Amino acid sequence: MECYLDNSATTKPCKAAVDAEISALTELYGNPSSLHQKGVDAYMLLEKSRGTIAASLKASPDEIYFTPCGTVSNNTAIFGAVGAKKRLGKKIVTTALEHPSVEKCMERLEESGFEVVRGQPQSDGHISLKDFENAIDENTILVSVMAVNNEVGSVMPTENLKKIIKSKNSPALLHVDDVQGYMKIPLCPKNCGIDLMSVSAHKVHGPKGVGALYINKNVRINPYILGGGQENNMCSGTQGMPAIAGFAC
Protein backbone atom coordinates (compact mmCIF):
# COMPACT_ATOMS: atom_id res chain seq x y z
CA MET A 1 0.00 0.00 0.00
CA GLU A 2 1.29 3.43 -0.92
CA CYS A 3 1.84 5.89 1.93
CA TYR A 4 1.97 9.48 0.68
CA LEU A 5 4.12 11.69 2.91
CA ASP A 6 4.63 14.80 0.79
CA ASN A 7 1.63 16.85 1.88
CA SER A 8 3.73 19.97 2.33
CA ALA A 9 4.32 19.93 -1.43
CA THR A 10 0.73 19.18 -2.40
CA THR A 11 -2.26 17.24 -1.15
CA LYS A 12 -4.68 14.77 -2.66
CA PRO A 13 -7.94 16.55 -3.53
CA CYS A 14 -10.74 15.45 -1.24
CA LYS A 15 -13.89 13.88 -2.70
CA ALA A 16 -15.95 17.00 -2.01
CA ALA A 17 -13.49 19.11 -4.02
CA VAL A 18 -13.52 16.66 -6.92
CA ASP A 19 -17.32 16.50 -6.92
CA ALA A 20 -17.57 20.30 -6.86
CA GLU A 21 -15.15 20.55 -9.78
CA ILE A 22 -17.06 18.01 -11.84
CA SER A 23 -20.35 19.78 -11.15
CA ALA A 24 -18.92 23.12 -12.28
CA LEU A 25 -17.41 21.51 -15.38
CA THR A 26 -20.58 19.74 -16.47
CA GLU A 27 -23.39 21.93 -15.17
CA LEU A 28 -22.19 25.42 -14.18
CA TYR A 29 -19.89 25.90 -17.15
CA GLY A 30 -20.92 29.44 -18.08
CA ASN A 31 -18.60 32.44 -18.08
CA PRO A 32 -19.33 34.37 -14.86
CA SER A 33 -18.98 37.62 -16.83
CA SER A 34 -21.80 36.64 -19.23
CA LEU A 35 -25.29 38.09 -18.78
CA HIS A 36 -27.31 35.02 -19.84
CA GLN A 37 -28.56 32.44 -17.34
CA LYS A 38 -25.55 30.13 -17.53
CA GLY A 39 -23.32 33.12 -16.86
CA VAL A 40 -25.49 34.28 -13.98
CA ASP A 41 -25.41 30.79 -12.46
CA ALA A 42 -21.61 30.72 -12.71
CA TYR A 43 -21.39 34.21 -11.20
CA MET A 44 -23.54 33.15 -8.26
CA LEU A 45 -21.22 30.19 -7.68
CA LEU A 46 -18.22 32.51 -7.92
CA GLU A 47 -19.57 34.86 -5.27
CA LYS A 48 -20.68 32.02 -3.01
CA SER A 49 -17.15 30.62 -3.23
CA ARG A 50 -15.69 34.04 -2.48
CA GLY A 51 -17.79 34.21 0.67
CA THR A 52 -16.57 30.80 1.78
CA ILE A 53 -12.89 31.72 1.42
CA ALA A 54 -13.54 35.07 3.10
CA ALA A 55 -15.12 33.32 6.07
CA SER A 56 -12.07 31.07 6.43
CA LEU A 57 -9.96 34.21 6.88
CA LYS A 58 -12.54 36.15 8.92
CA ALA A 59 -12.54 38.69 6.10
CA SER A 60 -15.17 40.36 3.94
CA PRO A 61 -15.98 38.83 0.54
CA ASP A 62 -14.90 42.05 -1.19
CA GLU A 63 -11.40 41.54 0.25
CA ILE A 64 -10.90 38.20 -1.54
CA TYR A 65 -9.53 38.01 -5.09
CA PHE A 66 -9.23 34.67 -6.86
CA THR A 67 -6.00 33.96 -8.74
CA PRO A 68 -4.66 31.00 -10.77
CA CYS A 69 -2.28 29.93 -7.96
CA GLY A 70 -0.28 31.01 -4.93
CA THR A 71 2.55 32.21 -7.15
CA VAL A 72 0.26 34.65 -8.93
CA SER A 73 -1.10 35.80 -5.57
CA ASN A 74 2.44 36.56 -4.39
CA ASN A 75 3.45 38.28 -7.62
CA THR A 76 0.27 40.37 -7.62
CA ALA A 77 0.74 41.41 -4.00
CA ILE A 78 4.41 42.33 -4.35
CA PHE A 79 4.41 44.13 -7.69
CA GLY A 80 1.02 45.69 -6.95
CA ALA A 81 2.16 47.06 -3.60
CA VAL A 82 5.47 48.35 -4.93
CA GLY A 83 3.74 49.98 -7.88
CA ALA A 84 1.35 51.78 -5.58
CA LYS A 85 3.96 52.85 -3.02
CA LYS A 86 7.09 53.51 -5.09
CA ARG A 87 6.85 57.28 -4.71
CA LEU A 88 7.17 56.89 -0.95
CA GLY A 89 10.40 54.90 -0.87
CA LYS A 90 12.68 52.36 -2.51
CA LYS A 91 13.24 49.82 0.26
CA ILE A 92 11.68 46.37 0.72
CA VAL A 93 12.23 44.07 3.69
CA THR A 94 11.87 40.29 3.41
CA THR A 95 13.79 37.17 4.49
CA ALA A 96 16.36 34.85 2.96
CA LEU A 97 13.96 31.90 3.33
CA GLU A 98 11.16 32.97 1.02
CA HIS A 99 9.50 30.85 -1.66
CA PRO A 100 10.88 31.44 -5.19
CA SER A 101 7.63 33.21 -6.12
CA VAL A 102 8.66 35.91 -3.65
CA GLU A 103 12.45 35.77 -4.00
CA LYS A 104 12.35 36.04 -7.81
CA CYS A 105 10.16 39.14 -7.48
CA MET A 106 12.73 40.63 -5.12
CA GLU A 107 15.53 39.96 -7.57
CA ARG A 108 13.55 41.66 -10.35
CA LEU A 109 12.91 44.68 -8.11
CA GLU A 110 16.60 44.91 -7.24
CA GLU A 111 17.36 45.03 -10.96
CA SER A 112 14.93 47.95 -11.17
CA GLY A 113 16.78 49.92 -8.50
CA PHE A 114 14.97 48.94 -5.29
CA GLU A 115 16.88 48.04 -2.14
CA VAL A 116 15.92 44.63 -0.77
CA VAL A 117 16.97 43.72 2.78
CA ARG A 118 16.72 40.01 3.65
CA GLY A 119 16.54 38.86 7.26
CA GLN A 120 18.85 35.91 7.87
CA PRO A 121 17.69 32.71 9.60
CA GLN A 122 18.98 31.61 12.97
CA SER A 123 20.17 28.04 13.55
CA ASP A 124 16.58 26.91 14.23
CA GLY A 125 15.28 28.41 10.99
CA HIS A 126 13.53 31.36 12.62
CA ILE A 127 14.12 35.01 11.73
CA SER A 128 14.74 37.34 14.66
CA LEU A 129 12.31 40.23 14.96
CA LYS A 130 15.39 42.35 15.70
CA ASP A 131 16.32 42.00 12.03
CA PHE A 132 13.04 43.66 11.10
CA GLU A 133 13.41 46.34 13.76
CA ASN A 134 16.84 47.19 12.37
CA ALA A 135 15.81 47.09 8.71
CA ILE A 136 12.42 48.80 8.57
CA ASP A 137 12.49 52.58 8.30
CA GLU A 138 10.58 55.50 6.78
CA ASN A 139 11.85 54.55 3.31
CA THR A 140 10.42 51.01 3.51
CA ILE A 141 7.35 50.47 1.32
CA LEU A 142 6.81 46.72 1.66
CA VAL A 143 7.50 43.96 4.16
CA SER A 144 6.94 40.49 2.68
CA VAL A 145 7.30 37.31 4.74
CA MET A 146 6.23 33.67 4.72
CA ALA A 147 3.97 32.72 7.64
CA VAL A 148 5.12 29.09 7.70
CA ASN A 149 8.26 28.02 5.88
CA ASN A 150 7.67 25.25 3.36
CA GLU A 151 11.07 23.60 3.92
CA VAL A 152 12.04 23.95 7.58
CA GLY A 153 8.59 24.56 9.10
CA SER A 154 9.51 27.68 11.06
CA VAL A 155 6.59 29.96 11.96
CA MET A 156 6.92 33.72 11.63
CA PRO A 157 5.32 35.79 14.44
CA THR A 158 3.46 37.91 11.90
CA GLU A 159 1.32 39.56 14.57
CA ASN A 160 4.36 41.57 15.70
CA LEU A 161 5.44 42.88 12.30
CA LYS A 162 2.75 45.53 11.90
CA LYS A 163 3.63 46.92 15.32
CA ILE A 164 7.23 47.30 14.20
CA ILE A 165 6.17 48.97 10.95
CA LYS A 166 4.05 51.49 12.84
CA SER A 167 6.76 52.15 15.42
CA LYS A 168 9.12 53.14 12.60
CA ASN A 169 6.61 55.58 11.03
CA SER A 170 6.93 53.50 7.87
CA PRO A 171 4.41 53.59 5.00
CA ALA A 172 5.12 49.90 4.34
CA LEU A 173 2.40 47.43 3.51
CA LEU A 174 2.65 44.00 5.13
CA HIS A 175 2.34 41.01 2.79
CA VAL A 176 2.21 37.49 4.20
CA ASP A 177 2.61 34.35 2.09
CA ASP A 178 0.34 31.95 3.99
CA VAL A 179 0.18 29.25 1.33
CA GLN A 180 1.86 26.71 3.61
CA GLY A 181 0.05 27.62 6.82
CA TYR A 182 -3.47 28.29 5.53
CA MET A 183 -6.14 26.20 7.30
CA LYS A 184 -3.45 24.57 9.46
CA ILE A 185 -2.34 27.37 11.77
CA PRO A 186 -5.04 29.99 12.48
CA LEU A 187 -4.08 33.39 11.09
CA CYS A 188 -6.57 36.24 10.91
CA PRO A 189 -5.17 39.00 8.68
CA LYS A 190 -7.27 41.73 10.29
CA ASN A 191 -6.23 40.83 13.83
CA CYS A 192 -2.56 40.71 12.82
CA GLY A 193 -2.55 43.93 10.80
CA ILE A 194 -1.81 42.08 7.55
CA ASP A 195 -2.56 44.14 4.45
CA LEU A 196 -2.08 41.41 1.82
CA MET A 197 -2.15 37.64 2.25
CA SER A 198 -1.68 34.83 -0.27
CA VAL A 199 -3.33 31.40 0.01
CA SER A 200 -3.70 28.38 -2.27
CA ALA A 201 -6.06 25.42 -2.62
CA HIS A 202 -3.77 22.52 -3.41
CA LYS A 203 -2.09 22.55 0.01
CA VAL A 204 -5.43 21.92 1.76
CA HIS A 205 -6.89 19.02 -0.26
CA GLY A 206 -8.27 21.31 -2.93
CA PRO A 207 -7.50 21.39 -6.66
CA LYS A 208 -4.39 22.77 -8.28
CA GLY A 209 -4.72 25.86 -10.43
CA VAL A 210 -6.43 28.22 -7.99
CA GLY A 211 -5.36 30.53 -5.20
CA ALA A 212 -6.60 33.69 -3.58
CA LEU A 213 -5.24 37.02 -2.44
CA TYR A 214 -6.62 38.85 0.57
CA ILE A 215 -6.39 42.63 0.20
CA ASN A 216 -7.54 44.71 3.15
CA LYS A 217 -10.41 46.91 1.97
CA ASN A 218 -8.53 50.03 3.10
CA VAL A 219 -5.48 49.17 0.99
CA ARG A 220 -4.99 50.05 -2.67
CA ILE A 221 -2.46 48.29 -4.87
CA ASN A 222 -1.90 48.38 -8.61
CA PRO A 223 -3.33 45.59 -10.79
CA TYR A 224 -0.68 43.15 -11.99
CA ILE A 225 -2.45 41.08 -14.66
CA LEU A 226 -4.29 43.33 -17.11
CA GLY A 227 -7.13 42.41 -19.42
CA GLY A 228 -10.88 42.10 -19.12
CA GLY A 229 -11.11 43.49 -15.61
CA GLN A 230 -12.16 40.34 -13.77
CA GLU A 231 -11.74 40.18 -10.00
CA ASN A 232 -12.48 43.90 -9.72
CA ASN A 233 -9.61 44.63 -12.14
CA MET A 234 -7.07 42.99 -9.81
CA CYS A 235 -6.51 39.71 -11.69
CA SER A 236 -7.88 39.79 -15.22
CA GLY A 237 -8.75 36.59 -17.05
CA THR A 238 -11.83 34.40 -17.06
CA GLN A 239 -12.09 32.73 -13.68
CA GLY A 240 -11.49 28.97 -13.56
CA MET A 241 -14.80 28.11 -11.96
CA PRO A 242 -14.24 24.34 -11.56
CA ALA A 243 -11.07 24.94 -9.53
CA ILE A 244 -12.67 27.77 -7.55
CA ALA A 245 -15.66 25.56 -6.74
CA GLY A 246 -13.31 22.82 -5.55
CA PHE A 247 -11.36 25.31 -3.45
CA ALA A 248 -14.46 26.55 -1.65
CA CYS A 249 -16.37 23.28 -1.25
Mark where each language-model region is.
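Pyridoxal 5′-phosphate
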Residues: 1-249
